[in-house]
């Protein structure tokens, strides 16, 4: 991995403007900035001369401006705007609505990985071709309003609104929809204040998770309860299958309803013009090596922002990496520590860390060969034309930082191992030189090929790389590849397994290696876990590995009162946040703070293989940070034993802690373990509390509403 830092080469000779700028701003000592000795010695004389020159030039300019204003009073001078980043503005402020009498349709999105945003923009683009008397505005839910009052003021003015909202984690809204979701959910007292609104909602989720499309369902229900009129049934996109098909089916229900609202009488009888989505393409400019000799090769997203987030991560070195499984295990689990000293990045116990990893070298090399580009090919990538006009009506997401090499772009920014969407197949087909390849790709993306797409790509877990290998004549240009074929490589999230009370300058991660065979026989290697497994820590080399990271706040927190009893349930790497909890409790205990009872249910396969952090856990018990450690081993005895079985054995104790106002925390796999634990908890409450099924449901729900039953699941 690139160790960062600027490009090599000799010292650059400062220009006259550089010298003047440095003098006037007082930037550094001249001898430290690479000034020639003769200039450095006469710095004060140069300051005097350049300042005098600046004053004379300024007077001359002022005189000219005054004369021009007198001779042409009706013409208002416009200063040329520098091509520099403008002050941060919300998009809706920077781009006022056109006052042309057209009907406005607001298209909102709440997205975590970009899919909801992509659907919103795709729908708006198609709608523009169908309704020339309407204007479709694509709006980020977070940027729509600065505060709750503005949300209400602006939303009540909307006449037609479409919502694309994804469900993230344990039934939670995405980061950019969280503020809106919280505000909107507290709107019972507002009554039916949206009586003028016509709305439609398309949710994005995964049916394998317990709270499938919860956010979409809640938003749809709240819009109706608060007076809105539903124009199309709630769309439930399922990412476990083909969410594009779900989106297209929902659109077909939407168009007839929009026809009624947006077509004038003369147009209603006319059939809409058939729409063929254009294949998006960034503008790419190849850069000659000699023109790029001064390119900064460090990670360009780490750009000095005071607040680190998903768009502006912090570069962090890998300080420590060690294997947590014993040599007897054929699997792997990594303990990794990111060094955040001196970065300004902070975290709290229970937070998540987002990590931008890189595709492994062998994957990148295969795609380079398939595309027909050298890894050292330099290029810049743009979402606008040369005159600054946005491409595709501004619907393209901002491209990644450039100029960069093809090798760097494929390693850092392209998702090469997820299965390709149907729109990607169409883009590949348009650049396939073999007609058979093109025909087959288009068939897979067509309604007639729906079943085949589901079996050959989704069920078989065929990656984009594998599909490109099957159709070698498809060689799209870089602009098409990054805009329409390869999605942006997303950060991977991990529950932080440390406490800032113990390690304020380190963020600990506990990561299981993702490694297994797919139905096609390919060995799938997880992008981030493989990177962590192969990373070089600072304790081994100064040329250590690093990654752009950021902290995502979580509500998975210890009780504010440390005397409140807690139950923690986390098998495998689900132990991660509880290691942080226990570090926090130990630090508090060492300062004399009284602690409540704490029980940990941990699970692994075999004590001699994958009992991670065993010594640490025993130490937590010995020091009193942990009251009771209960471990389930699933591969030691004659029958498999999991954490939910241990919970059932401890049912009276669990009920006692709950009855005392205790908190329950669950971390780990949402599809299996978390469901089983939830059922077991339901049984314990029902049997120990002597409640019927209905009252049990209400009781468990009240624990969740009170924040006493928290889950960090994936």
Swiss-Prot record:
Top-level EC class as recorded in UniProt: oxidoreductase
Enumerate the transmembrane spans: 45-65
Q: What Gene3D superfamilies does the entry give?
A: 3.40.50.360, NADPH-cytochrome p450 Reductase, Chain A, domain 3 (1.20.990.10), Nucleotide-binding domain of ferredoxin-NADP reductase (FNR) module (3.40.50.80), Translation factors (2.40.30.10)
In short, the EC number is: 1.6.2.4
Cofactors = FAD; FMN
- Say yes or no: keyword Transmembrane present: yes
Q: Which residues bind FMN?
A: 111-116, 166-169, 204-213, 239
| Top-level taxon in the UniProt lineage | Eukaryota
Q: Where does NADP(+) bind?
A: 331, 573, 634-635, 640-644, 676
Q: List the catalytic activities from the record.
A: 2 oxidized [cytochrome P450] + NADPH = 2 reduced [cytochrome P450] + NADP(+) + H(+)
Membrane side Cytoplasmic: which residues? 66-714
The way it spans or sits in the membrane comes to: Single-pass membrane protein
Positions the record marks as coiled coil are none
Keyword Flavoprotein included in the entry's annotation: yes
Q: What does this protein do?
A: This enzyme is required for electron transfer from NADP to cytochrome P450 in microsomes. It can also provide electron transfer to heme oxygenase and cytochrome B5.
Family per record = Belongs to the NADPH--cytochrome P450 reductase family.
Query: Could you tell me what this protein is called?
Result: NADPH--cytochrome P450 reductase 3
Q: Which organism is it from?
A: Oryza sativa subsp. japonica
Q: What is the lineage of its organism?
A: Eukaryota, Viridiplantae, Streptophyta, Embryophyta, Tracheophyta
């Amino acid at each position: 991995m690139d160790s960062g830092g600027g490009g090599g080469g000799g010292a650059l000779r400062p220009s006259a403007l550089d010298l003047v700028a440095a003098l006037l701003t007082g930037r550094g000592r001249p001898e430290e900035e690479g000034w020639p000795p003769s200039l450095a010695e006469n710095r004060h004389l140069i300051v005097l001369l350049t300042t005098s020159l600046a004053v004379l030039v300024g007077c001359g300019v002022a005189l000219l401006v005054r004369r021009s204003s007198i001779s042409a009073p009706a013409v208002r001078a416009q200063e040329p705007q520098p091509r520099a980043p403008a002050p941060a503005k919300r998009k809706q402020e920077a781009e006022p609505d056109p006052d042309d009498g057209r009907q406005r349709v607001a298209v909102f999105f709440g997205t975590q990985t970009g899919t909801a945003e992509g659907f919103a923009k795709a729908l708006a683009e198609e709608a523009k071709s169908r309704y020339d008397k309407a204007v479709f505005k694509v709006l980020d839910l977070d940027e729509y309003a600065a505060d709750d009052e503005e949300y209400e003021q602006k939303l009540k003015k909307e006449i037609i609104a479409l919502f694309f909202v994804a469900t993230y984690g344990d039934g939670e809204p995405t980061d950019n929809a969280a503020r809106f979701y919280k505000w909107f959910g507290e709107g019972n007292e507002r009554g039916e204040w949206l009586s003028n609104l016509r709305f439609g909602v398309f949710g994005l989720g995964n049916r394998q998770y317990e709270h499938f499309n919860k956010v979409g369902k809640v938003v749809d229900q709240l819009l109706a309860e608060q007076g809105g009129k539903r124009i199309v049934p709630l769309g439930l996109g399922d990412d476990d299958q083909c969410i594009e098909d779900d989106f297209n089916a929902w659109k077909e229900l939407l168009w007839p309803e929009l026809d009624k609202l947006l077509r004038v009488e003369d147009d209603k009888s006319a059939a809409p013009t058939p729409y063929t989505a254009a294949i998006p393409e960034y503008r790419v400019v190849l850069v000659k090596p000699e023109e790029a000799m001064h390119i900064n090769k460090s990670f360009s997203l780490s750009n000095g922002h005071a607040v680190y987030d998903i768009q502006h991560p912090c570069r962090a070195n890998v300080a420590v990496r060690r294997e947590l499984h014993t040599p007897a295990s054929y699997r792997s689990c990594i303990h990794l520590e990111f060094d955040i000293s001196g970065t300004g990045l902070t975290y709290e116990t229970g937070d998540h860390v987002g990590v931008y990893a890189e595709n492994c070298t062998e994957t990148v090399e295969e795609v380079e060969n398939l595309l027909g580009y050298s890894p050292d090919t330099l290029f810049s990538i743009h979402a606008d034309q040369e005159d600054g006009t946005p491409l595709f009506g501004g619907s393209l997401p901002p491209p990644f930082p450039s100029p960069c090499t093809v090798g760097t772009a494929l390693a850092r920014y392209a998702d090469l191992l997820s299965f390709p969407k149907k729109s990607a197949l169409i883009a590949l087909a348009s650049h396939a030189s073999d007609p058979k390849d093109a025909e087959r790709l288009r068939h897979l993306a067509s309604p007639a090929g729906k079943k085949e797409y589901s079996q050959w790509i989704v069920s078989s877990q065929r990656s984009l790389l594998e599909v490109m290998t099957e159709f070698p004549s498809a060689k799209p240009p870089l602009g098409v590849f990054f805009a329409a074929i390869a999605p942006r490589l997303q950060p991977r999230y991990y529950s932080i397994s440390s406490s800032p009370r113990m390690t304020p300058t380190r963020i600990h991660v506990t990561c299981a290696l993702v490694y297994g065979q797919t139905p096609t026989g390919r060995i799938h290697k997880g992008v981030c876990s493989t990177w962590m497994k192969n990373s070089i820590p600072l304790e081994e080399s100064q040329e250590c590995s690093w990654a752009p990271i950021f902290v995502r706040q979580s509500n998975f927190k210890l009780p504010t009162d440390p005397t409140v009893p807690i139950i923690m349930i986390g098998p495998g790497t689900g132990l991660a946040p509880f290691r942080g909890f226990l570090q926090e409790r130990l630090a508090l205990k060492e300062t004399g703070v009284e602690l409540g009872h704490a029980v940990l249910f941990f699970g692994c396969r075999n004590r001699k293989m994958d009992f991670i952090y065993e010594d640490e856990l025993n130490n937590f018990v010995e020091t009193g940070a942990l009251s009771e450690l209960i471990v389930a081993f699933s591969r030691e005895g004659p029958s498999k034993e999991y954490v939910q079985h241990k919970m059932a054995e401890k049912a009276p104790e669990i009920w006692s802690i709950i009855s005392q106002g205790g908190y329950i925390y669950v971390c780990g796999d949402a599809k299996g373990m978390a469901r089983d634990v939830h059922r077991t908890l339901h049984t314990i409450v029902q049997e120990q509390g002597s409640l019927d099924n209905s009252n049990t449901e209400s009781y468990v729900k009240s624990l969740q509403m009170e924040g006493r039953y928290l889950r960090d699941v994936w």
